[in-house]
Amino acid sequence: MTSLRRGIALSVLGLAGLYTVAVADEPKFKGTVLDQVPLGGLNGDYIMKVTMLDMEPGAQIPEHTHKGPGLRYVIEGAITIAWKGRSTETFKAGSTYFEAAGSNHPIGQMSARNAADGRTRVLIFELDPKE
């Protein structure tokens, strides 16, 4: 875990942006982009985006999509994912899961919610096409 934290700390060179979604008095969730790095050696131009997802108790992320595939690492709490055509899965602190654009994560076919009594934090690594 120490090497993971050290690696994350070294890769976090600047805050590239952030987003927050909330409706009325619903619990909030916020994703903060920690870094974006151009990647070579792939067909096309891609960036690796690292985002910290911070979810308040009871927060829900509506159906959505991502531009590219990515690995998720649950740092704290638990997140329940409703996958397309499958039952839900809950991932607790210390576990990982993978989301791939178009397969288990088509547009409007996946949602998430904080499954913990407290705050949930998920580190998201995404491989996105460069715009």
Q: Language-model features: where?
A:
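Ligand-binding loop in jelly-roll beta-barrel domains
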Residues: 88, 101-131
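Sec/Tat signal peptide C-region and signal peptidase I cleavage site
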Residues: 18-26
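Extracellular/periplasmic catalytic domains that process cell-envelope and extracellular macromolecules
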Residues: 45, 65, 73, 90, ...
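Glycine- and acidic-residue-biased ligand/ion/polar-headgroup-sensing regions
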Residues: 67-86, 95
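Bacterial N-terminal signal peptides that target proteins for export
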Residues: 1-9
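Bacterial N-terminal signal peptides
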Residues: 9-18
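Short acidic-glycine-tyrosine-enriched beta hairpin
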Residues: 55-56, 85-104
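A short glycine-rich, His/Asp/Glu-containing loop-to-beta-strand
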Residues: 28-62, 120, 125
